[in-house]
């Protein structure tokens, strides 16, 4: 049985990520099923930070297809280079969007989303195999601290792809 996520009583993201990372490593320890692993990681991130939507889109041919997530119903498919997720996939880099209404071609899966961060996950050959997508109802809710920490989370997920 999986142990519950335990966190310090703080809103400081550095402290929260520091406490969460070993717990994510433990969630992934000896878990080889990508669906199970991605489901637990999305739950751990949403539980820790309370973001509106946390989940994964997997590369399937020429589009991203929704995978495990926590939050409201999501867009099912996103084209290469479309929206924030498709752009992060195409450009193979983390994208932080402080105000989604200002992002050209933003795909509004939820009208409540104000800011977003998308982090690519690479396979063993270095190709983008999936993306981690996180939406917040707060404007400018993500910064480089989040980007760096979430990139570390995605590195832990690489062996699943």
Regions found by a protein language model. Give the residues of each.
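Intrinsically disordered, low-complexity terminal regulatory regions
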Residues: 1-73, 152, 156-161
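A short, aliphatic-rich beta-strand micro-motif
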Residues: 115-123
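A generic structural signal for residues located within well-ordered alpha-helices
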Residues: 33-36, 80, 113, 145
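A generic structural motif
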Residues: 138-140
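Short hydrophobic/aromatic beta-strand element in the GNAT-like acyltransferase core
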Residues: 53, 118, 131
């Amino acid at each position: 049985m999986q142990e519950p996520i335990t966190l310090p009583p703080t809103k400081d993201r550095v402290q929260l990520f520091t406490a969460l990372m070993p717990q994510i490593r433990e969630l992934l320890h000896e878990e080889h099923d990508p669906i199970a692993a991605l489901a637990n990681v999305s739950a751990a991130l949403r539980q820790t930070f309370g973001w509106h939507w946390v989940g994964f889109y997997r590369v399937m041919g020429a589009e991203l297809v929704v995978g495990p997530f926590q939050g409201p119903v999501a867009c099912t498919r996103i084209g290469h280079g479309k929206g924030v997720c498709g752009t992060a996939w195409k450009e193979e880099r983390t994208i932080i969007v402080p105000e989604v209404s200002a992002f050209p071609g933003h795909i509004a899966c939820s009208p409540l989303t104000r800011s977003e961060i998308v982090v690519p996950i690479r396979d063993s050959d270095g190709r983008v195999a999936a993306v981690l997508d996180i939406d917040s109802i707060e404007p400018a809710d993500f910064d480089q601290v989040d980007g760096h920490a979430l990139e570390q989370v995605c590195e832990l997920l690489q062996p699943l792809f």
